[in-house]
C-alpha cells in the first residue's frame, strides 16, 4: 500500500450525523422501579442484611440499585445472595458491584424487562460528542446511567476486541469505523482493513478513507502489516530528525 493524498479531499464533505439511525425512546416505569426496590429491600431484610436503598440508576439495558450497609454488616452477606436475588425478582441474571468503585456502597444491577435499543446516532449526536474536537474520538455506546461513552483512539495505540459469539464484536468495530468516517476527512485518516472471512468489512470498499481495498488474502495482509511497520519506523525517524 502507498499513502496518497486524495485530490477529492479538497471538496470532501463529511456526512451528517443525522444519517445514523437513533434508538427509540423508552423510559423505565417508575412504578416498576419502586416495586423492584421494595422486593429487593424485603429480601435483604428476610436474610438479616441491614441495609438502606440510597439510589436507583435506570439505564438502557439494566438498572442499578445502590445500597449502603449498616455498620458491622459484611459485604459477603450480600454477595452470597446473588442467586436468591435473581430467583426472587424472576430475572435470569444479577450482577453485583461490591463495592461500587470509589464509594462505600454496593450496586445490584438487574436487567430491564424492556431494553432500549442503543444506536450509534444516539452517541454521536449527543452534547458530549459535539464538545469533543479530536477527530479520533469514537462512539462506543451508553453507560448504565444512559450517558454517552466515547473513546479517544490516540490514547489507545493497541486495542483488542474480544468476546464470545453474539457478544457484539462486529457491532463495536463498525461503530468505531463509522465514527471515524463521520468525524474525519480522508486526508486526516487512512485505514487498512483485513477481512479474511470476506463477510465483515466489504461494505467499506468504496469509502475514500481506505488506503487500499479491503484485504481478504492472507499473504496481502502480511504485506500490509509489513508496510505499516515500515511506515511507523519512517515516521519515528522523521520525528527523531526533527528534535
PLM regions and their residue ranges:
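Non-catalytic, charged/low-complexity accessory segments that flank nucleotide-binding cores
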Residues: 16-134
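Hydrophobic face of alpha-helices
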Residues: 5, 34-37, 79-82, 174, ...
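Short, conserved glycine- and acidic-residue-centered signature motifs
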Residues: 4, 33, 74, 154, ...
